[in-house]
Design a protein with these regions (language model features):
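N-terminal signal-anchor module of multipass membrane proteins
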Residues: 1-56
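C-terminal ends of transmembrane helices
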Residues: 9, 57-69, 106-117, 204-213, ...
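Small-residue-rich segments of transmembrane alpha-helices in multi-pass membrane proteins
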Residues: 77-88, 125-138, 226-234, 253-260, ...
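A generic, well-ordered mixed alpha/beta core segment in the N-terminal half of proteins
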Residues: 77-151
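Long hydrophobic alpha-helical segments that form multi-pass transmembrane helix bundles
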Residues: 117-203
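Loop-to-transmembrane alpha-helix initiation sites
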Residues: 120, 124, 245-253, 275, ...
């Protein structure tokens, strides 16, 4: 009698292995990482390097000494978690806070559930939200673009979403004139976390993932379409208070979340209909949090809630 073998997700039904898909996502992230390095210089390099190394080391230690199993770092998932965590952080974040975030991301968000396939939340987002709650001051300092040799001493400025939130709150000195031009939002000439700076670079990554069939269009398109439509409705209701819908797509973690985080195999639906509903609710929640919540950005919370 044949045995029924039960194993945790992700269950890959194509010819691609988990490892090949992980490394394909790493390749897709390369343009955005390059833009962040060009935009923030030394700070971006330190954040990404520390995040990746800390995530890989944390997984290796837990696997070897706690689970007493062969190392799993070769599958690329720890590297990807480290890269995604780093892309969700400001370039001025002290290295020791990055290490704490990596330990939480891998130790709590992934390995506490048994490792890859068992986790119910995206590990990088678990680490990011933990740091946002534990170290709100450091996590909301946004260095200006172009300070290539600065790290923790970089001159900071408000992000586009921070300016929009300030306008909604009636903060003196905040105006729509301070918002970067659309071209700057596309190419990355503004402040923010490493993964916020260039929508165009992230869209290039999306094209690669779709071409390689690593992901399907359902989740990214449903997130972006819902955010655009709902953001547009709110802009029509009060254009002086709520930004235009294109602004919602090009700022914050909208592109990074829609393309690289909400599409996580383990924590997203498998059916096309489920993915469309899942994406639509993430897009709706993100705009609701941005416009009516206490945080300027809502993508991380929306994905974790869903």
């Amino acid at each position: 009698m044949d045995r029924l073998i039960i194993s945790p997700s992700p269950h890959i039904h194509s010819g691609d292995s988990v490892e090949r898909n992980m490394y394909a996502v790493l390749i897709a992230l390369a343009p955005a990482c390059l833009v962040s390095l060009v935009t923030f210089g030394l700070g971006a390099f330190i954040v990404l390097a520390v995040s990746v190394l800390a995530c890989v080391l944390t997984e290796w230690v837990i696997t070897k000494y706690l689970y007493k199993q062969p190392s799993t770092i070769g599958d690329g998932s720890a590297i990807l978690t480290g890269l995604l965590l780093g892309m969700n952080l400001p370039s001025s974040l002290p290295w020791w806070i990055i290490v704490i975030g990596a330990i939480v991301a891998i130790g709590v968000g992934k390995m506490s559930f048994g490792g890859l396939g068992g986790n119910i939340f995206n590990p990088a987002l678990v680490g990011r939200v933990f740091l946002l709650i534990a170290y709100p001051a450091q996590m909301t300092l946004w260095p200006k673009a172009g300070q290539y040799l600065s790290y923790t001493d970089a001159v900071t400025s408000a992000t586009p979403l921070g300016i929009a939130k300030g306008i909604q709150a009636g903060t003196p000195g905040m105006s729509w004139d301070q918002i970067p031009a659309t071209s700057d939002l596309l190419f990355g000439i503004h402040g923010g976390s490493l993964g916020e700076v260039s929508a165009l670079a992230l869209l290039l990554g999306l094209g690669f993932l779709l071409y390689r069939r690593v992901i399907t269009w359902h989740i990214p398109v449903s997130i972006l379409a819902t955010a655009f439509v709902f953001g547009g409705i709110m802009h029509l209701v009060n254009p002086a208070l709520y930004p235009a819908p294109l602004f919602q797509l090009l700022t914050g973690g909208m592109m990074l979340g829609a393309i690289f985080m909400a599409t996580d195999y383990v924590t997203s639906p498998m059916s096309a209909r489920g993915q469309l509903l899942y994406g639509a609710l993430i897009g709706l929640l993100t705009i609701l949090i941005r416009l009516f919540g206490s945080y300027p950005e809502g993508m991380s919370f929306a994905i974790l809630i869903m």
